Amino acid sequence: MNDKFTTASFLESKKQGRKITMLTAYDYPTAKILDEAGVDSILVGDSLGMVVLGYEDTTRVTMDDMVHHTKAVVRGVKRAMVVADMPFLSYHTGKNDSVRNAGRLVSEGGCKAVKLEGGEDIIENVKAIISAGIPVVGHLGYTPQSINVFGGHKAQGKTIDTAKKIYRDALLLQKAGVFAVVLECVPYKLAAFISKRLDIPTIGIGSGPDCDGQVLVIHDLTGMFKDFTPKHVKKYAEIGETVSTAVKSYIDEVKNGVFPTEKNSFKVDDWIIDELDKVRFDI
């Protein structure tokens, strides 16, 4: 458990049939908890746009946002491999921009790899980033940055044409040199088919049990939000309810004079207060 998880660890896990665990984190304390709990990899996802910054989708997340949050996560990690998302339009305008932006996430942010959404349409930029010495994770199926193209959060690969495209893109990404690929909201039989035919590991989210690993958004897994739970999520806690209950108790105790008590306060000698009572300031 003390050995650092690396790109080689991803590939070795695939060969050995060991499932890979990945979760998102966007700040130092969460990253520290996940790392100490033993998760293999931490994704600084552009999902922070929704679960941290309050946007409707991921398309408004900037490079500066990603660098800022990646820095915080990296400070909390000793073992897990940190992967950072490249945000919308940061790798679509050419090889130079793609390499420059990926380089910022590594050199400024401190992550060990970057993740990009898309297949054949971005393959040359993927190759350029890898050629620059930056490891890349692919992302196929439902790609959140394309939400306006898809018309919402929808499973992908349910027709023969879309299934062929996802499979072909996975093969192209593997040939380009990515060391893993995320499959999001892909029908589980298609995800299993692709996983068996790739030499690199697949990381599933809403894509069934036969992927080589799994990733979830930490806010979904811990039940931080009550209003919406995606179909592919299993809640392992109800942190939102716990925090809400704690805050209500705090409000009640403050208003009723229950908190704080002397136990929560610092003491000073009585004579100091007596002396202060004699002081008169010329103000």
From Swiss-Prot:
One of its GO terms (biological process) is pantothenate biosynthetic process. SUPFAM superfamilies: Phosphoenolpyruvate/pyruvate domain. Keywords: Cytoplasm, Magnesium, Metal-binding, Pantothenate biosynthesis, Transferase. It holds the Pfam family Pantoate_transf. Binds 1 Mg(2+) ion per subunit. Pathway: Cofactor biosynthesis; (R)-pantothenate biosynthesis; (R)-pantoate from 3-methyl-2-oxobutanoate: step 1/2. GO terms for cellular component: cytoplasm. GO terms for molecular function: 3-methyl-2-oxobutanoate hydroxymethyltransferase activity; magnesium ion binding. Its cofactor is Mg(2+). 3-methyl-2-oxobutanoate binds at residues 46-47, 85, 115. It is found in: Cytoplasm. Transmembrane segments: none annotated. Its EC number is 2.1.2.11. Mg(2+) binds at residues 46, 85, 117. The active site is at residue 184. It catalyses: 3-methyl-2-oxobutanoate + (6R)-5,10-methylene-5,6,7,8-tetrahydrofolate + H2O = 2-dehydropantoate + (6S)-5,6,7,8-tetrahydrofolate. The keyword Ligase does not apply. Its main location: cytoplasm. Catalyzes the reversible reaction in which hydroxymethyl group from 5,10-methylenetetrahydrofolate is transferred onto alpha-ketoisovalerate to form ketopantoate. Belongs to the PanB family. Homodecamer; pentamer of dimers. This is 3-methyl-2-oxobutanoate hydroxymethyltransferase. It comes from Acetivibrio thermocellus (strain ATCC 27405 / DSM 1237 / JCM 9322 / NBRC 103400 / NCIMB 10682 / NRRL B-4536 / VPI 7372). The gene is panB.
